[in-house]
Regions:
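Active-site pocket-lining/capping segments in soluble small-molecule metabolic enzymes
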Residues: 1-63, 81-85, 90-144
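Conserved nucleotide-cofactor-binding alpha/beta core module
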Residues: 66-67
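As written
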Residues: 76-77
Length: 144
């Protein structure tokens, strides 16, 4: 979808937002329980075009403090999936400061050497972007 989107929006007179809305419409028509998103521009677009659609903020948005949670809440995100790197005390502080939003945390799984959403190794070595779900786990290779 991303490659087609870029190719289509390079054409003269094509507006990126209109193309993104057209691409998103069939997804919304399926009536998903929620969309997991991390791009502020796309979140804004979905909020305007489909205000009732539930949005969960992806862990790849790297939300690490209560101020960031409040920002995302103000723009209409319904649930925040917090960064994997947070301690239990940090999660508790966020909950205390932001009692009115759903929070989700990972309790098991891979923990990258970089902060969630900030690793560039896979993209650099293999042209596969971790933020698009295709991380090659370059940080776990046996380097010599």
């Amino acid at each position: 979808m991303a490659v087609r989107f870029c190719a289509e929006t390079e054409a003269p007179g094509v507006k990126a937002r209109e193309t993104a809305e057209a691409d998103m419409a069939p997804v919304i028509a399926l009536k998903p329980d929620a969309l997991i998103m991390s791009d502020p521009g796309l979140i804004d677009m979905v909020r305007e075009a489909w205000p009732e659609q539930v949005i969960h903020l992806s862990v790849q948005a790297n939300t690490v403090n209560w101020a960031a949670v409040r920002f995302w809440q103000k723009i209409g995100v319904d649930r925040i999936i917090l960064s994997r790197e947070l301690s239990l005390d940090e999660v508790a502080e966020i909950r205390q400061q932001c009692p009115d939003i759903e929070l989700e945390v990972f309790v098991h799984g891979a923990l990258c050497i970089a902060y969630s959403g900030r690793c560039l190794l896979s993209g650099y070595f293999n042209h596969r972007d971790p933020n698009q779900g295709s991380c090659t786990n370059s940080c776990r290779w046996d380097y010599k």
